[in-house]
């Protein structure tokens, strides 16, 4: 919440919330996957109440569907929520979108990045949010529990893409929230590189 607030009052354009537990599986009346409170939904509610900010766009690139976030925000037309997961869904108003994650192929990183760009870029540009939130899980890396065959290149590429998307859609305002991932060796490899790219973009 503090990271989001610093963006909204103009102290910073981008912030990384190094959360110790997940949030996107916590819904209105359920929780799972070590997610007890939905950090993103709580931050949105706070920013609306404290700062009058209305429109938010979320890209969830955790390997698993953000079912809790969707449960809370499903009927909110001022939140664009896009998940790259194993599902395929578009709400009637186009603000809630699930796309199947690409699997296999010769270059999983490139396929994943192209999917993220194709599904999010045009939507967020048209939606014009006040703030973009990237729910960043690294559990899709090779060998983690959500293995999509991805490497460091995919996550660094996503960071570059999100900085550019935020710059075009909402004046660069981007909050990155750490999501799933279980291996400390991968966390040590990936997270510092992503933070560096977010800071240098």
Task: Walk through the language-model features, giving the residues of each.
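A general "terminal functional-core" signal
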Residues: 1-201
